[in-house]
């Protein structure tokens, strides 16, 4: 009798387990999605605390990029844009369009030579005040993208761009 109970119990557990897993996944799907999104955001973006005040950080980034020969476009006041769109208590956010010289041209040449599509870099540095009142600088995590590149030539160029970005932010971020 006990020989039959164990196999029957295992069979019942095997048949019921997918149902329990399906119920658990339905209950935890939103949490799993949030965790995966947070992991993706952590990998994609480089967020660092500034050593300076808000406006000083914006000015320092613009000056540092300009000294290095980067193109620097007009700073977008995202807080003002959100306020005009009706957002109350919009956080302080400024977006500085800037990129190392010919960064996207270098990527385009690799794309053309390899026949593989490579999207351009967004070439933006964002300065914001977080919920704790700290000035933060956020940009694309080019160093991570370089490590994740599927072929050597792309990894090399992305690594160079990451080093240029790091040099531009030296002394501004922690």
Q: Over which residues does each language-model region extend?
A:
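C-terminal partner/receptor-binding element of secreted or periplasmic proteins
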Residues: 143-174
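A mature extracytoplasmic/lumenal domain signature
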Residues: 61, 76-78, 99-102, 131, ...
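Terminal, regulation- and interaction-focused segments at domain boundaries
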Residues: 23-73, 81
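Bacterial N-terminal signal peptides
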Residues: 7-16
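Sec/Tat signal peptide C-region and signal peptidase I cleavage site
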Residues: 18-22
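Beta-strand/loop substructures that line and gate deep hydrophobic ligand-binding cavities in soluble
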Residues: 124-151
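Positively charged n-region of N-terminal signal peptides that target proteins for export
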Residues: 1-4
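Compact, glycine-rich, soluble single-domain proteins
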Residues: 66-74, 78-121
């Amino acid at each position: 009798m006990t020989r039959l109970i164990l196999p029957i119990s295992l069979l019942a557990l095997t048949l019921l387990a997918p149902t329990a897993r399906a119920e658990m996944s339905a209950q935890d799907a939103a949490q799993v999605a949030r965790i995966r999104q947070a992991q993706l955001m952590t990998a994609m973006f480089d967020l660092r605390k500034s050593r300076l005040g808000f406006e000083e950080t914006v000015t320092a980034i613009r000056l540092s990029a300009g000294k290095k020969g980067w193109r620097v476009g007009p700073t977008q006041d995202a807080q003002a844009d959100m306020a005009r769109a009706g957002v109350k208590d919009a956080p302080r956010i400024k977006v500085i369009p800037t990129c190392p010289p010919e960064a996207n041209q270098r990527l385009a040449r690799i794309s053309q030579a390899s026949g593989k599509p490579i999207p351009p870099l967004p070439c933006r540095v964002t300065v914001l005040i977080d919920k704790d009142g700290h000035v933060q600088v956020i940009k694309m995590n080019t160093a991570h993208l370089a490590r994740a590149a599927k072929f050597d030539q792309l990894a090399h160029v992305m690594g160079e761009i990451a080093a240029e970005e790091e040099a531009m932010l030296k002394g501004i971020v922690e």
